[in-house]
Amino acid sequence: MTPTAVPATPTEIPATPTPTETPATPTATPVPEVDWYQAMLDRSVMYKGNNARLKKVIEKARSGETVNIATLGGSITEGANATPWTLGYAYRFAEKFAAEYGVNGGENINYANAGIGGTPSALGVIRYERDVVEALGAEPDLFVIEFEVNDYAEATKGRAYESLVYQVLSQSNDAAVIMVFAVRSDMWNVQDEHYPIAIRYGIPVVAIKNAVEPAIAEGQLDKNVFFSDEYHPTNYGHDIMSDCIMQMVRVLDTAEADEMKPLAEKAIKGRNFVGTKMIDSATEGIAIEAGAFTKVDGEIQRFSTKMLPSFPNNWMHDGAAGNDSFKMTLNCKNLLMNYKTGSGAFGTAEVYVDGKLVKDLNGAGGWNNSNVVLLIDEKEAAEHVVEIRMAEGQEDKAFTIYAFGYTE
């Protein structure tokens, strides 16, 4: 497998244990030969969907053609609490896929991990072009999407998620999509919200809750062995997740081929955010007056996988430059804004659209993490003026605008 802009193959590969019928231990490695383990993998295959696209990807891989795989999601996809991160489920899946279906050790498989902790699909749709297509140098052939524990109260109410799925399926390369429904340790996620989207487009669904909840309840799998905290798997849990995705791939690989079907004409949530474009301070051709937001914030959220800043071309008000407004004039239908919540002296900014106050955004109380809000949501494109300034009494506080995402 050829990673794209990611570290080299991990050096800590878990040893294969002797199969056992006893529950897992903290040092255990997944053992597919054991009945309860295989039953868990079988349960993870929530919905097989239409297999035509995935079969095409598998055939490309086997024939030696280049196959580009991308994963997009939150911290679980990023590899949080896997040590090292290359033992996270996303990288492990790409590794296993490359070994099983690629040629010459998977040299024809390229992979990009676009997970960022604490982020919803509304930020994913902003980042797709940069962090998936540009990172790979091509559109993905296989796209794995995971936002199940991050999309609670998501700004677009599911439309960004469906837009991402539809955008990938609409590519000229007949790309395949796999939805991964991760789960918190309390067995909560938003899979009931996203599952209808899978049905509408015939997308395979791997449901981790369906897999592990019965195993935990029956004492076959220790919850504290699978989960490292409330949200994130251990190395062992990440490897189980990767095995669940591989189970889906193997099931569809051996199934009778489906006929490729045209994309559904009617959306479930909405496709308003297909083709979303990112705006940051390096973007040209957008009318922006930075006002007092002229600094660059260096204390920002990073990609754990690459240790690179997630939004380096930001606009920061540092509390010492006055209170001149940030102004942007833009022709758009939809506009998303991504701002930072940080520790220390961060304050509240007011956001105006066409002179009307639409948001009060508190930039304090976070860990440099991203927060996405929807500022404009229209059916037709029109010229809008967006103005951002510190709230009264907050002029000496800091506030950082990470980026915007818009549709034309």
Predicted regions located by residue number:
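Extended, polar beta-sheet/loop recognition surfaces of beta-rich domains
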Residues: 395-408
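Glycan-recognition and processing domains
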Residues: 254-329, 338
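Contiguous, non-catalytic segments that form substrate-binding/exosite surfaces or channel walls
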Residues: 332
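Serine-esterase "nucleophile elbow" of acetyl-processing enzymes
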Residues: 31-114, 129-138, 327, 335-337, ...
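Alpha-helical cap/lid subdomain in secreted, periplasmic
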Residues: 94-108, 119, 123-261, 317-321, ...
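Generic beta-strand hydrophobic packing signal
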Residues: 114, 291-296, 335, 361, ...
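Ser/Thr-rich, Proline-interspersed low-complexity disordered segments
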Residues: 2-31
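Short, conserved micro-motifs enriched in small and acidic residues
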Residues: 83-84, 232, 274
